[in-house]
């Protein structure tokens, strides 16, 4: 299919969901380009995101839609949604309120390896998760 023919298809027709009906979504800060998180979307969460311009994902652990920030207040306003060349990965460019990570950090990628293979924190703690979500067992 030529590039021009491909652009004639609708965005939703182009997305290749996996055998579970999911597609990975990489989430990036609209202003800085910093990668904030990776989450899964199904068709319903993607349609809701397109309609509301607020990020909505599919929670594999809870098996339900997850409007980012509904319990924490750390919403993601969606500016752009890009699709990769294979159609099987999305990139959401968002304005993030508060931290993206449920551990309280700006990004879920808040740890990096050191030369000795230990890890160090490399991100900003935005909130105390116990204050937002309560004590985790």
From Swiss-Prot:
The gene is hisI. Pathway: Amino-acid biosynthesis; L-histidine biosynthesis; L-histidine from 5-phospho-alpha-D-ribose 1-diphosphate: step 3/9. Zn(2+) binds at residues 85, 101, 108. Homodimer. GO terms for biological process: L-histidine biosynthetic process. This is Phosphoribosyl-AMP cyclohydrolase. Keywords: Amino-acid biosynthesis, Cytoplasm, Histidine biosynthesis, Hydrolase, Magnesium, Metal-binding, Zinc. It is found in: Cytoplasm.
